[in-house]
Amino acid sequence: MRATAALRVELAADGRNVVRELRSQPPITLIPRRGVASAAGGPAVVHLVGSATSPMGGDRVDLRVHVGAGAALRLSGTAATVALPGQRTGHSRATVRIEVEAGGTVEYLPEATVVSGRADHRADMRVELAEHARARCREVLVLGRYGERPGVLTTSTHVVRAGTPLLRQRLDIGEQRLAASAGYLAGARVLAAETVVWDHDPAAPAGGQWWSLAPLSGGGALATSVAADAVTAQRGLAEALGHHPDAEALTRELW
């Protein structure tokens, strides 16, 4: 399967955040939320819906997002994604590219990705921010379904602001000896992480029971939580974000 979806949001003259381009292609279906939030000048809210079984071996799926100057977008998932083996040889790949112009804001909050046994999946996220742009990008990985060891997973995250790299991170899953190491995942099945580039940066790192909030040297912060299940991991992530100086803005809900 080959698929490309695209989303563009701009700030209208009346102060509303307007979806100017919305192009879906299975397995990615983009559904905008209409009504009160947009009319009141809140962010444009778009839901990310899986409309076909994917990713499977050999699939190539791309999502491209552009947020104009001063505009705000919240792109949120509705259900978990399951990476599966396929009849074709070779790995599957999902690529997310996000561009945010000056003064723009993006919140990319997909649901979890479950890496099933025998899957071989690559996930790449690249975020390019202009000066004074804001972003929060979440990733939740569930390593195997119940009672199942995960297949192979490689994720990479690249965040750049005004040409300066803020985060370049890669994670490789599939080596059982590493999975049990305290310096790796310590046997945890779920990893939740969120990269935050907002109005303020944490003055110092914070941490608790299997969660942490670490300021990045070039600006922004990385919140991380590991746990035996997704609910606990996301609670840990919420606790980490609660120690961010912009916690109130980062923990609000839009329904």
Curated annotation (Swiss-Prot):
It comes from Saccharopolyspora erythraea (strain ATCC 11635 / DSM 40517 / JCM 4748 / NBRC 13426 / NCIMB 8594 / NRRL 2338). The keyword Chaperone applies. Keywords: Chaperone, Cytoplasm, Nickel insertion. HAMAP family: UreD (MF_01384). Signal peptide: none annotated. The keyword Cytoplasm applies. It comes from the Bacteria. Belongs to the UreD family. Required for maturation of urease via the functional incorporation of the urease nickel metallocenter. The gene is ureD1. UreD, UreF and UreG form a complex that acts as a GTP-hydrolysis-dependent molecular chaperone, activating the urease apoprotein by helping to assemble the nickel containing metallocenter of UreC. The UreE protein probably delivers the nickel. This is Urease accessory protein UreD 1. It is found in: Cytoplasm. GO terms for molecular function: nickel cation binding. GO terms for cellular component: cytoplasm.
